[in-house]
Design a protein with these regions (language model features):
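Alpha-helical transmembrane segments of multi-pass membrane proteins
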Residues: 39-46, 77-82, 86, 92-115, ...
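Signature of the first transmembrane helix
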Residues: 1-49
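Transmembrane alpha-helix boundary and packing residues in multipass membrane permease domains
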Residues: 19-23, 37, 53, 57, ...
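Membrane-interface helix-capping segments at transmembrane helix termini in multi-pass transporters
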Residues: 25-34, 60-71, 80-104, 148-154
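Structural signal for membrane-spanning alpha-helices in multi-pass inner-membrane proteins
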Residues: 18, 45, 84-88, 139-143, ...
Length: 176
């Protein structure tokens, strides 16, 4: 199930999300969007994955409790957002709406990368599958939000939020 979960997630990204963004944004803006998404993957992905792996390896020796990584993820996400906003300013794309959406995407994605750790710890492959299903469905619904708002980051933000909401209800990872 865990292979199917990530396969579904990647299929939605590669065959629905990215092609739709490519078609609607145009070559230049799509290239900029991919670079911005690379920043999200590198910065927020590293932050969230570091917390995820740290929790996995420290589980037996340090006995961390749920919520222990919340502050780290928030601070890490804010630092990622600061770097991302500097980049937007540098390439002269910083507007109030892009600042809000990109900062939110960077912060939420850091948390999302961490969110599946409890499913791994408890070997709950069904919940792990539904976590990635929630993100995938969120990305697809996010394309509708993008069509209405004309803000491409809303497509991704919707998917990330769907994943976080599922993790918040299906696990205790963010609760003390």
């Amino acid at each position: 199930l865990n292979i199917g979960a990530t396969a579904l997630f990647n299929l939605v990204i590669q065959f629905a999300l990215y092609p739709y963004l490519n078609k609607t944004l145009g070559k230049e803006m799509y290239g900029t969007a991919l670079f911005m998404l690379s920043l999200v993957a590198i910065a927020s992905g590293s932050c969230g994955t570091a917390a995820n792996y740290s929790r996995l390896v420290s589980e037996k020796t340090l006995r961390p409790s749920n919520g222990d990584y919340n502050l780290f993820l928030l601070v890490g996400g804010i630092l990622c957002a600061a770097v991302g906003l500097f980049y937007l300013w540098w390439i002269k794309l910083l507007t109030p709406i892009t600042a809000i959406l990109f900062a939110a995407l960077l912060i939420v994605t850091a948390f999302r990368y961490y969110s599946d750790v409890e499913f791994k710890l408890k070997t709950s492959f069904v919940r792990y599958f539904f976590f990635y299903l929630a993100i995938s469905v969120g990305y697809l619904l996010g394309l509708l939000v993008y069509r209405k708002t004309n803000q491409w980051m809303t497509a991704l933000l919707t998917g990330e939020i769907f994943g976080l909401v599922y993790a918040a209800f299906a696990s205790r990872i963010y609760r003390h």
